[in-house]
């Protein structure tokens, strides 16, 4: 009996039946309801609300919890300090200098205490280690003067104190190291090009429409500054959870979206707003996705724009994302570039605007089959003819051109118009 039940359980696992103990399923997989099918499992949405993987501002919604090996942050202390928020960075900056001043001030006071200088304050015949050092406060002030190299005034070290000379050398060297480390952290944090990404824009929506009789996923990018991004490049990834045929659940699986890295179109000359296009072909993850399936799928497209800041030469990165609800089928972007007298003008008021266009509702795979069979034109709605007097004038001009054409060209034109 035990062997039969074990065989039955193994058979259930092979055909994709849900295990009887839900606690053995990972937490990420329990958020979805598996549906048993023949040799595979499909994922149905659970009751858990949708969550963006990346905000429109570029911030990733990923929190690292239960980190056990926190000592790894100290192994790269410089990067840890640079990544801190400004209030914590300033707090560390102040505390490091204050602690070093207090530490060496205590040592100066300890030397004076051991030598007996504190018992001979005001004695003209006594030669102390540090003149006019009467207590811990004066030792602390002397430590600040030594480390910041602002110059000695009322308090000064004497040559009759070898231990003081050694301490002076040690504090001077360690003070230089602290200055280099802390000032370097502040300089790197100030010069970070994060704010440069604030002037790089992404359209609020992505669109899917026809380009050269092929379905394309498109979004628009722009740069508000007159100083350009050097060596700008764009890439995109599809974030979508999936389940393999063996039943393995892969949360937030990342798939590359080709935006021209095989042809060099991903290298941008970002002087004016550009429309980034992804051709939906056999290698695209949207190859079999129709308009109806777009409304049912759950995915997120993450776009990353990288380049060097022209003024500083530092690498800058801007990010954004598009949920499935932010992808508009059958839309195109409104043009923003106009030609003026002697220059081109960009109207950013219409940067995010789109308009509807004639686009088939079928997937790119079916569209390619129609094109091979010659049935594509009958599925594309023709644009409306102009009405009124303008339409009559156009028809009259067309008839006049038809009479002037040779017989062979006229027949070919009639055949093309009928198609």
From Swiss-Prot:
Pfam families: IRK, IRK_C
Acidic residues compositional bias, start-end: 394-406
Biased composition (Basic and acidic residues): 407-419
Extracellular side: 112-135, 155-163
Start and end residues of each stretch annotated as Disordered: 1-22, 382-419
Means of activity regulation: Heteromultimer composed of KCNJ3/GIRK1 and KCNJ5/GIRK4 is activated by phosphatidylinositol 4,5 biphosphate (PtdIns(4,5)P2).
Gene3D superfamilies, sorted: 1.10.287.70, G protein-activated inward rectifier potassium channel 1 (2.60.40.1400)
GO molecular function, one term: voltage-gated potassium channel activity involved in atrial cardiac muscle cell action potential repolarization
Keywords: Ion channel, Ion transport, Membrane, Phosphoprotein, Potassium, Potassium transport, Transmembrane, Transmembrane helix, Transport, Voltage-gated channel
Any one GO BP annotation for this protein: membrane repolarization during atrial cardiac muscle cell action potential
Membrane-embedded but not crossing: residue ranges: 136-147, 148-154
Tree of life domain: Eukaryota
Oligomer status and interactors: Associates with KCNJ3/GIRK1 or KCNJ6/GIRK2 to form a G-protein-activated heteromultimer pore-forming unit. The resulting inward current is much larger.
Known function: Inward rectifier potassium channels are characterized by a greater tendency to allow potassium to flow into the cell rather than out of it. Their voltage dependence is regulated by the concentration of extracellular potassium; as external potassium is raised, the voltage range of the channel opening shifts to more positive voltages. The inward rectification is mainly due to the blockage of outward current by internal magnesium. Can be blocked by external barium. This potassium channel is controlled by G proteins.
Protein name: G protein-activated inward rectifier potassium channel 4
Origin species: Sus scrofa
Lineage of the species this protein comes from: Eukaryota, Metazoa, Chordata, Craniata, Vertebrata
